[in-house]
Amino acid sequence: MWSLSYGIFIVSSCFEGKANGQIANTVFQISAEPARVAVAINKENYTHQFIEKSRMFSVTVLDDETPMKLIGVFGFRTGKDVDKFEGVETIEGDFGCPVVTEHAVSVFEAKVFDSVDVGTHTLFVADVVNGKMLTDKPPLTYAQYHANKGKAPEKAPTYRGAAGEKAPTYTGVEPPNAPTYRGPETGK
């Protein structure tokens, strides 16, 4: 699982005059026509409540020069205790919510039309209602972030826990022509 490629994004939403945002690595395009995306948000994250109630969100695609300070504001603090948007470059989106433009490659807003409970997370499926490219800088990937910036927070899907890297456990199902893997106990 650790070799899957991810981006690093700020997903934001607002409800009843209050806004919140968070770092997310699971944002992906579903279709081009109509323009549809999905985001996976941990149910325990404050942003989840905002998206669930408002049925909308914005996404900021961060550039590969994004400082750890900005990632830290949206990734390691709760909006219950602090206004994450204070001192951060934003524009007001069509939904009336702040959209982060600081270190943004692009931004877009989306309206949720479906959601799927996937255990610890909800997958919000949405139609993109607007978007804008802001620069041609390359986007920040999770691999770059992990190599250069630090470790995933505990609620992130890519969190590895205190034990560090763990080998996947054997499921008994192997694809054809795959090398045999029996788990860490056999060393193979």
Where are these regions (language model features)?
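Basic, polyanion-binding surface patches
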Residues: 1-188
